[in-house]
Amino acid sequence: MTADPDFSDLTEREMAALIYRITDELSTRGTRAAFAELLQVVAYVGERVGVAARTLAASNSWSQVAEVSGTSKQAAWERWRS
C-alpha cells in the first residue's frame, strides 16, 4: 500500500468486514510470517478494544460498555478502565 486509505466514509460494519476478510486471508496462508503478523494483530486489537471501551465510557457511560460487551458495569470497568 502506497498511501493511507480514507476509511471515514465506511460504516462500522463495512470496516469490520474488511478486517474479517484480511484476518481470514492471514489465517489461511499457512506461513510463519502470516502467523506472526496475525499474533501481532491480535495484540493490537486487544489494546484498541480497551481504548474503544474507555472512549465509549467517557462519551456515554460504563453501563453502555457493559451492555455492548455483555458483562456487568463493574466487570467492564475493571477490565478496561486503564
Question: Where are the language model's segments positioned?
Answer:
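General nucleic-acid-binding
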Residues: 1-27
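Short, Lys/Arg-enriched anionic-surface-contact patches
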Residues: 28-51
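Short alpha-helical segment immediately N-terminal to, or the first helix within
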Residues: 54-56
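Residue-level signal for the short linker/turn that defines the boundary of a DNA-recognition helix
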Residues: 59-61
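The alpha-helix within a helix-turn-helix
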Residues: 65-66
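Key DNA-contact positions within bacterial/archaeal DNA-binding proteins
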Residues: 74
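Key DNA-contacting residues within the recognition helix of helix-turn-helix
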Residues: 77-78
